[in-house]
From Swiss-Prot:
HAMAP family: CobQ. The keyword Zinc does not apply. It comes from the Bacteria. InterPro entries: Class_I_gatase-like, CobQ/CobB/MinD/ParA_Nub-bd_dom, CobQ_GATase1, CobQ_N, CobQ_synth, GATase_3, P-loop_NTPase. The gene is cobQ. One of its GO terms (biological process) is cobalamin biosynthetic process. This is Cobyric acid synthase. GO terms for molecular function: ABC-type vitamin B12 transporter activity; catalytic activity. Pathway: Cofactor biosynthesis; adenosylcobalamin biosynthesis. Keywords: Cobalamin biosynthesis, Glutamine amidotransferase. It comes from Xanthomonas euvesicatoria pv. vesicatoria (strain 85-10). Belongs to the CobB/CobQ family. CobQ subfamily. The active site is at C331, H429. Catalyzes amidations at positions B, D, E, and G on adenosylcobyrinic A,C-diamide. NH(2) groups are provided by glutamine, and one molecule of ATP is hydrogenolyzed for each amidation.
Length: 478
């Protein structure tokens, strides 16, 4: 079997590529078509653990769920996780191979592309359709040489491309016309059509612009997708721009937006909860009174620990606990809660040690080998079942671990609870993705909006406006 391959590229970052691919994956899966997602190269700090013990971008894990599949490393063969302004950890087929700066990665691209093509070859043999997501924009002139994420990949495998633009941010016609103008003749020829995303208002008022666009570019407008309010899907990098503010909140959560924040998708289920008010606090902002301070993961924990101190979070946390508040650290956040954090090999930056915040009696040493596990177990606070995943390069030890937060099904324990029950920590990401009975131990009721409810919601409008002429490009005959 050899699959039909369609690639979705965007005029900009955050144009809606991930959501559109997830929506189409869901629709095709419901038609009984064997479909798989694919992203050749992803740059993201939010990642997920696969069934084969690797690491891929969260968007591809969500798209896999839309296809009725477990996440697999072939869905995202190259993942770049920035750990500074100029460098990133390079993950190939789910496992770290190097930490490189931009020049070093440019030299490594040929090797990375071989990994991309190997994953592509396996997927097209297993599935009827492979839906591919590009990265950023295909028109970044400085990144076009040896490109493996957008048109470089499309040219190599000879697939059709659909170009998506976000009308909500403005300039949609300039984005589309300009992007097409910056492509080579062969690249432009493989663009099958364009899609306008996040439209609000009367479609009739847009029609003259669509007619002009088709005349100007020679490309059909394949669809105009509506703006979907309250769509809580996993983000890859940016912290969500709009956190709900619920005047009737029964749980108030504050999250510091760390400079190197990683896997901030841990708060997504809280953002979707109608009675949880999540406040994302950046530099220069004063943390408001709350029930829970959540310290998220970090790709550079010692750097972000110093950032917390510089911005007065150590004093804010002490005041919060003094008045009976709760404090939870996840992964890097757990490490910050200990007494010391050691990085003798320079895994996350300059080698050295840093004092922790000191709220849990444990210390952590960073190690070269990354721990990647999907886990199931029970929360020892409230006796609720949990599932999630571990992604870290650390070994923690100390008296606090004698009172763990989780009992895992593989016999291990995880995390810690302080003697007074106010301070908690865990290495398991995704603890809020499943029924949140344990939050009831602190405040308020249990509720979540599961992804299997959200995915059909984004799939329906994506397909309802998708002309049937598009299906003839790539859907296999039965």
């Amino acid at each position: 079997m050899s699959a039909r391959v369609l690639m979705v590229q965007g005029c900009t970052s955050d144009a809606g590529k991930s959501t559109l691919v997830a929506a189409l994956c869901r629709w095709l899966h419901r038609q009984g078509i064997a479909v798989a997602p694919f992203k050749p190269q992803n740059m993201a700090l939010n990642s997920a653990v696969t069934v084969d013990g690797g690491e891929i971008g969260r968007a591809q894990a969500l798209q896999a769920q839309a296809c009725g599949l477990e996440p697999q490393t072939d869905f995202n063969p190259v993942l770049l996780k920035p750990n500074s302004d100029t460098g990133a950890q390079v993950i190939v087929h789910g496992h770290p191979v190097a930490t490189l700066d931009a020049v070093g990665y440019h030299a490594y691209k040929a090797t990375a592309f071989n990994a991309v093509l190997a994953s592509h070859a396996r997927l097209v043999e297993r599935f009827d359709v492979v839906l591919v997501e590009g990265a950023g924009s295909p028109a970044e002139i400085n990144l076009r040489d040896n490109d493996i994420a957008n048109m470089g990949y499309a040219e190599a495998v000879d697939c059709a491309v659909i170009l998506v633009a976000d009308i909500d941010r403005g300039g949609v016609f300039a984005h589309l016309v300009g992007t097409l103008a910056l492509l080579s003749a062969s690249e432009r020829a493989r663009v099958a059509g364009v899609v306008i995303n996040r439209f609000r208002g009367d479609l009739a008022l847009l029609q003259p612009g669509l007619a002009w666009l088709e005349r100007e570019t020679g490309k059909p407008v394949l669809g105009v997708l509506p703006y979907l309010h309250g769509l809580q899907l996993d983000a890859e990098d940016a912290v969500p721009r709009n956190a709900p503010q619920e005047p009737q909140s029964q749980l108030r959560v504050v999250v510091p937006v760390l400079p190197r924040i990683s896997n901030h998708t841990d708060v997504d289920a809280l953002l979707a909860h109608p009675q949880v008010d999540v406040r994302l606090i950046g530099p220069g902002q004063t943390p408001p009174p709350c029930d829970l301070i959540l310290l998220p993961g970090s790709k550079s924990t010692r750097h972000d620990l110093q950032w917390l101190r510089t911005h007065g979070w150590d004093a804010a946390i002490a005041r919060h606990l003094r008045y009976g508040g709760k404090l939870l650290g996840i992964c890097g956040g757990l490490q910050m809660l200990g007494t010391h954090l050691h990085d003798p090999r320079g895994i996350e930056g300059a080698a050295g040690s840093s004092p922790g915040l000191g709220w849990l009696s444990l210390q952590t040493t960073l190690q070269p080998h990354k721990q990647l596990h999907r886990v199931h177990g029970r929360l020892l606070l409230g006796d609720a079942s949990v599932s999630g995943y571990e992604i870290h390069c650390a070994l923690s030890s100390g008296a606090a671990l004698a009172r763990p937060l989780l009992q895992l099904d593989d016999g291990r324990t995880d995390g810690a609870i302080s003697d007074d029950g106010q301070v908690l920590g865990t290495y398991v990401h995704g603890v809020f993705d499943h029924p949140m009975h344990w939050l009831h131990c602190w405040r308020g009721p249990v509720w979540r909006r599961p992804r299997h409810w959200i995915l059909p919601r984004c799939a329906k409008p994506a397909w309802s406006v998708w002309p049937m002429r598009c299906t003839r490009i790539w859907i296999p005959r039965h």
